């Protein structure tokens, strides 16, 4: 992608795109691997630091290209070790990236959009509307910046980040091409070399793009379910009015079937007091998912101002988990992490600039979510 300087930002190029770039400037394709290693393995953003690249080529690159990550506005560290970065992107808006450490892994939660058009009623990101899609460089740049922050370069030595989840701000499948490109870089050995089983894309249910996904990439899939029936899900997750549960689950099953192997769908379910946390909801969920190979991740609601929802009691949370477990499901309840720095699930809000233009974009992308058409670049692969 060309930046405001008129130069190509190499940070967001996949390996084939990087090879094409070097072709276009009359250089050998093997240079793509050299430069990608400098960018992603060593966190270099200055061509002058690339010691195995000749001076003439470095000067040539300086003239036509750059390595420009998004800007870190702030970094907060929670008492539990969770980190949150506020990152400014080219649109002027800010997005948030969260790192969650546990005993055996370090998970980076990456944003795909500034704001979100899907307007899920319990999510603070949706309350701010939609501003812009992130570029591939801005998506993968969150991984690049986190590695730099931890000092884990080379990136594949004693890495802090073992897993990446596309569960930050935005609906990843409404930024299809850029998210796919970024995930390919995450998994490429010339990028971050993260296993495909450790890269997860979470969607609220953009069915045409789920159907398209397996043609482009093989990653783990998570579904933001949040309700066990269409009537309730229509209220909580409005895209359900376009793609109801039967169609949505068939699409998810189709994705897993196409890729083969022992695939398991991660089902995310935010528990809202007296809304979707009752025994009848658990019973409906057991019936809904009976034939779906899945694991269920319960997420107690993380309150934010004016949400209109409350977190269930610990007893209600345990009761719901026990009912699902007795129904034969592998169920975990997500421990709230980073809520003292507003980094918990559902709390990411960033900062969206230019509210009038944002509203226009919001309306446009809401229409897109209701009437999805594949982008030309997706259809041509």
Curated annotation (Swiss-Prot):
Citing just one GO molecular function, the answer is: 4 iron, 4 sulfur cluster binding
The coiled-coil regions, if any, are: none
**Catalytic residues identified in the record:** 96, 345
Disulphides: 109-345
Tell me the residue numbers annotated for binding [4Fe-4S] cluster.
Answer: 116, 120, 123
The protein's required cofactors: [4Fe-4S] cluster
Q: Which GO terms describe its biological process?
A: rRNA base methylation; tRNA methylation
Q: Where does S-adenosyl-L-methionine bind?
A: 170-171, 202, 224-226, 302
Q: Where in the cell is it found?
A: Cytoplasm
For the Radical SAM core domain, which residue ranges apply?
Answer: 102-342
Q: What's the Enzyme Commission number for this chain? A: 2.1.1.192
The further comment given in this record reads: Reaction proceeds by a ping-pong mechanism involving intermediate methylation of a conserved cysteine residue.
Q: What does this protein do?
A: Specifically methylates position 2 of adenine 2503 in 23S rRNA and position 2 of adenine 37 in tRNAs. m2A2503 modification seems to play a crucial role in the proofreading step occurring at the peptidyl transferase center and thus would serve to optimize ribosomal fidelity.
Q: Which family does it belong to?
A: Belongs to the radical SAM superfamily. RlmN family.
- Name it: Dual-specificity RNA methyltransferase RlmN
């Amino acid at each position: 992608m060309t930046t405001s300087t008129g130069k190509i930002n190499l940070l967001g190029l996949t390996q084939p795109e990087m090879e094409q770039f070097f072709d276009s400037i009359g250089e050998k394709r093997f240079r793509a691997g050299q430069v990608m290693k400098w960018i992603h393995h060593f966190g270099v953003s200055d061509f002058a630091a690339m010691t195995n690249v000749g001076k003439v080529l470095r000067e040539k690159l300086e003239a036509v290209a750059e390595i420009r990550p998004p800007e870190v506005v702030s970094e907060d560290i929670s008492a539990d070790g969770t980190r949150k970065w506020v990152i400014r992107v080219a649109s002027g808006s800010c997005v948030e990236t969260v790192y969650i450490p546990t005993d055996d892994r370090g998970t980076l939660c990456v944003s795909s959009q500034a704001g979100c058009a899907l307007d899920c009623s319990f999510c603070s990101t949706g309350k701010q509307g939609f501003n812009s899609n992130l570029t591939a460089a801005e998506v993968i740049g969150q991984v690049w910046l986190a590695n730099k922050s931890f000092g884990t370069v080379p990136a594949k030595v004693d890495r802090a980040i073992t897993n990446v989840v596309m569960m930050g701000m935005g609906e990843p499948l409404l930024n299809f091409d850029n998210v796919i490109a970024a995930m390919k870089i995450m998994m490429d050995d010339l990028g971050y070399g993260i296993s495909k089983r450790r890269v997860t894309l979470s969607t609220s249910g953009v069915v045409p793009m789920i159907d398209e996904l397996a043609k482009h990439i093989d990653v783990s899939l998570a579904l933001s379910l949040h309700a066990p029936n269409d009537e309730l899900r229509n209220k909580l997750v409005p895209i359900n009015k376009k793609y109801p549960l039967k169609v949505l689950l068939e699409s998810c099953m189709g994705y897993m079937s196409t890729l083969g192997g022992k695939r398991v769908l991660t089902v995310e379910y935010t528990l809202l007091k007296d809304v979707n946390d009752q025994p009848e909801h658990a019973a409906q969920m057991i019936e809904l998912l009976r034939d779906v190979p899945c694991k269920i991740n319960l997420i107690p609601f993380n309150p934010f101002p004016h949400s209109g929802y409350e977190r269930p009691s610990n007893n209600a949370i345990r009761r719901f988990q026990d009912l699902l477990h007795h129904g034969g499901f592998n169920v975990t309840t997500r421990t709230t992490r980073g809520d003292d720095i507003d980094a918990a699930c559902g709390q990411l809000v960033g900062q969206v600039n230019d509210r009038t233009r944002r509203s226009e974009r919001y309306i446009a992308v809401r229409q897109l979510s209701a009437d999805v058409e594949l982008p030309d670049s997706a259809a041509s692969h």
